[in-house]
């Protein structure tokens, strides 16, 4: 990626982690349709590989603003996709895709991080991967840890995530009939792919 800074990429990962970790509340729903968010989306679209995915997400957000009982419907979508059985869902856990759920724990230890007791999900939840990537991108800008070490850990994290993220995103597209989380997962997929190629 050439246009976005490490800190901006960190913010995108943190934002996506938040959206995939819990249902949106009224404040978040208002925020994603705000002028401030539109500016942020414009910035993301300055990165050509992200343009189509951001456009689709903006379309879903526009549809969301006219959806009856938007918050409740989106909460139902979240629950159906991420909290139910895996038959018609996109469970946000590495272990649901036959991946090593211990890998993220090793990566967190290597980064000197632990999961929060406030987040009542297994450590292999998608949001944990995204928080780790956010932390690593922020660390790149701080200069307190050698960049090579951070970059090595970033690449390991991206590789571990990429092993199951495409299937997760495909399941989001398949089972999210409204399309908000499908669009969100597509944006994440493109972001991770670009980040992974930016060695």
Curated annotation (Swiss-Prot):
Keywords associated with the record: Chaperone, Cytoplasm
UniProt KW Chaperone keyword: yes
Domain of life: Bacteria
Localization: Cytoplasm
Record-linked InterPro entries: Chaperone_TorD (IPR023069), DMSO/NO3_reduct_chaperone (IPR020945), HscB_C_sf (IPR036386), TorD-like_sf (IPR036411), TorD/DmsD_chaperones (IPR050289)
SUPFAM superfamilies assigned to the protein according to its UniProt record, in alphabetical order: TorD-like
The family this protein is said to belong to: Belongs to the TorD/DmsD family. TorD subfamily.
Role description: Involved in the biogenesis of TorA. Acts on TorA before the insertion of the molybdenum cofactor and, as a result, probably favors a conformation of the apoenzyme that is competent for acquiring the cofactor.
Protein name per UniProt: Chaperone protein TorD
Organism: Escherichia coli O7:K1 (strain IAI39 / ExPEC)
